[in-house]
Amino acid sequence: MARLKVGIVFGGSSEEHAVSVKSAQEVARNLDTEKYQPFFVGITKDGAWRLCDGPGQDWENGDCRPVVLSPDRSVHGLLVLEQGQYRSVRLDVVLPVLHGTLGEDGATQGLLELSGIPYVGCDVQSSALCMDKSLAYVVARSAGIATPDFWTVTGDETIDPGRLTYPVFVKPARSGSSFGVSKVCRPEDLATAVESARRYDTKVLIEAAVVGSEVGCAILGNDPDLIVGEVDRIALSHGFFRIHQEEQPENGSENSTPVVPADIPTEKRSLVQETAKAVYRALGCRGLSRVDMFLKEDGEVVLNEVNTLPGMTSYSRYPRMMAAAGLPLSEVIDRTLSLALTGKLR
């Protein structure tokens, strides 16, 4: 039986480029190459697309050829430039391993919709919705899901610091990981935090701090057939959780440790999982996502954010939560590809 041709797209021009490369390395290690034939498409930080041998740390200096993903449905794949001529490579499915702007905000998904190639993960609408935390909060609230109190600042707008109750978190509304995020405890520090967030997005989100534990839940599937991973909890020694901000995240964080399974009572774990599924459905997610939440002392679960293409590195939360539930990364990859092709969990 012929192997299915899988385009694995990684890298990208967002601030999460390096994390994407590491995620792609883990995907490459865990892909069943007896079943799938991978075509690795790396996107440089400058936005150039290259067909390469694999997502090694020095992949750009290897045997790379210029490539584009054709929006022409008759091509159904890649156009590779070789010796001054383009040749086409028909793909059966695409697995985006991209994080942040232009990777999980609906842009890449729109190109894939034009191409007609099935792809892993959320569609254009849900990708864009989840990327904009303020819009995700609006939709979640309409579905009866608790969110932090929040305000948005766009363009040259300002906000009266005296309106807020501190502490607050200031963050780019449409950015991944913890880039540009600040905890503000005094009104006089608000303007600086807003300017820091504007380095990453023209729309800034200001959230009232939620007192509680940070918890997460990995989800795999299409509604109504969903698999939920074990819940995790972020154990903090001080400060706040800054994912992917360390120079060597493989060696752990200086202030946080993910605990999987979360050391919380069974009934609270179940509530977190049910809330995560409600968020997933309300925001129209499909394929996979990681839902991050807060668990308050009174038992209320509050939405933090949704990652539609969560990290797949050796230290990432999503694969750890799924592994704790009995699904190794190789199985997760296989099931997401099956979902993209058939719409059903096998």
Swiss-Prot record:
Annotated compartments: Cell membrane
UniProt-annotated binding residues for Mg(2+) 2: 305, 307
Residues holding Mg(2+) 1: 292, 305
Domain of life where this protein originates: Bacteria
Cofactor: Mg(2+); Mn(2+)
Protein topology in the membrane: Peripheral membrane protein
Enzyme class, spelled out: ligase
GO terms under cellular component: cytosol; plasma membrane
InterPro entries, per the entry: ATP-grasp (IPR011761), ATP_grasp_subdomain_1 (IPR013815), D-Ala_lig_Van_CS (IPR000291), D_ala_D_ala (IPR005905), Dala_Dala_lig_C (IPR011095), Dala_Dala_lig_N (IPR011127), PreATP-grasp_dom_sf (IPR016185)
UniProt keyword terms in alphabetical order: Antibiotic resistance, ATP-binding, Cell membrane, Cell shape, Cell wall biogenesis/degradation, Ligase, Magnesium, Manganese, Membrane, Metal-binding, Nucleotide-binding, Peptidoglycan synthesis
EC number: 6.3.2.-
SUPFAM superfamilies: Glutathione synthetase ATP-binding domain-like, PreATP-grasp domain
Binding site for ATP: 163-216
Cofactor note as given: Binds 2 magnesium or manganese ions per subunit.
Pfam families to which the protein is assigned, alphabetical: Dala_Dala_lig_C, Dala_Dala_lig_N
GO molecular function annotation: ATP binding; D-alanine-D-alanine ligase activity; metal ion binding
UniProt record, GO biological process: cell wall organization; peptidoglycan biosynthetic process; regulation of cell shape; response to antibiotic
Domain called ATP-grasp: residue spans: 137-338
Other known facts: S.coelicolor was found to be of intermediate resistance to vancomycin although it does not produce vancomycin.
Primary role: Required for resistance to glycopeptides antibiotics. D-Ala--D-Ala ligase of altered specificity which catalyzes ester bond formation between D-Ala and various D-hydroxy acids; producing a peptidoglycan which does not terminate by D-alanine but by D-lactate, thus preventing vancomycin binding.
Protein family according to the UniProt entry: Belongs to the D-alanine--D-alanine ligase family.
Record protein name field: Putative D-alanine--D-lactate ligase
Organism: Streptomyces coelicolor (strain ATCC BAA-471 / A3(2) / M145)
